[in-house]
Amino acid sequence: MTSLVEPVADLVPLQAIFLDVDGVLCCNDYAVLQPELLANLTMAIENTGAVVVVSSDWRLFPSKFTELCRALKHRNIRVIGKTQPSDTEGARPLEIIRFLTTFHAKMKRQSKPFRIKRWLAVDDR
């Protein structure tokens, strides 16, 4: 099986969208991605060249994470990672900061010039 997360080899500097799914791409009771909402995200990605980091609870469920990554890849949206969950309620901002810190440290250790220079979180919370 190929990796769902893509390398960042040709992206300098990086712009990232930390993406929630429920309430953003899935506003229904069926946990189904909505094409019109995916189209909005696709337009934003095309206009900015941003990559995606999944911060949604969908990252915790392998089948939902796979479904999301495949849907995004189908639209030429690159997923470069996912945040690590925290046990603390409402900790999503801290999870994002932890991802950025870890990502930058990893790139530095590998002597790679990749840094996320700009980012935003798209979340309904």
Question: Each predicted region: which residue ranges?
Answer:
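C-terminal cap/substrate-recognition subdomain and adjoining C-terminal extension
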Residues: T66, L72-R125
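Short amphipathic alpha-helices and their capping/turn segments at secondary-structure boundaries
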Residues: T2-P13, M43, L100-R115
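Alpha-helical substrate-recognition element adjacent to the catalytic core
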Residues: D10-G90
